Amino acid sequence: MRVKYVFTKKSFDKIVEDHLVNRCYLPYNKVIYKKSFSESVTLLTNFGIITGIMYTKNGKLNREDGPAIQYFNKQGTVYGEKYFLNGEELDEFQVIVLNSKNENTISKN
């Protein structure tokens, strides 16, 4: 299972701290991040934790960018996804409501 994470600066800094201080396990993944914390990305890349880097619009996840976390099977097909808003995981109904209101601030932070 491959997991693609989408972070805002706040959550990414927490991941960096958890890895460096608590030595928590991070799977190989693609991290979407803001330019402003490229030093942290470089640090994690040097540890071999990050294998790919991309950018998002304004460093936030939106409906065009996809969900906050996507789970892939071995064939590369998405079989699960999670959305977050203000640090809280959203259920399927909440996502439908936000999309119907044309909300574009769904993010993991």
PLM feature spans:
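Glycine/tyrosine- and acidic-biased, solvent-exposed loop/turn segments at the edges of beta-strands
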Residues: 3-6, 14, 18-109
